[in-house]
Amino acid sequence: MVEAQIPSLVPIPGVKLGLANIVTIFALFAYGPKDALLILLVRVVMGSIFSGQITTVFYSLAGGLLCWCVTVLLRKFLSDRQIWVASVIGAVFHNIGQILVAIVMTGTPGIVVYLPVLMVSGILAGLFTGLCAQFLFGKLRNLGQF
């Protein structure tokens, strides 16, 4: 909801920072998969309601759930100093999930040609949000919150 108020950095449809993912990836590493999933589901539903675009729930859920599954698996192999890695890989799978939904909803497999553009933006956004989550995690850990 907050991110919708920020002007797009690039004039490409579907490309955004994914600031809400900072909270989800942070929650996954700080509190575990269940809490991260709850946060993901609530923010997707609330975002769709407040944006007034109910169809976005399908794209957001597909991308978010695929991202969540992958990052839950990665969490088993990564330390809390590698949150950014999970975020980057999760962003890639988030984009794959969204493209798959777009193909199903439109019946146009040719949409897959848009995937490389989304991959580049997803990797950059995933790196940014992952570094933010990792920074937050480190600061709160130093304050004795974990």
Residue ranges and their predicted role:
Residues 3, 7, 28, 39, ...:
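Alpha-helical transmembrane segments and their lipid-water interface positions
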Residues 4, 28-29, 48, 72, ...:
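Transmembrane helix-loop junction
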Residues 19-33, 70-74:
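Generic transmembrane alpha-helix motif of multi-pass integral membrane proteins
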Residues 34-76:
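Helix-adjacent hinge/juxtasegments
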Residues 53, 57-58, 76-146:
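Membrane-embedded alpha-helical hairpins and interfacial helices in multi-pass inner-membrane proteins
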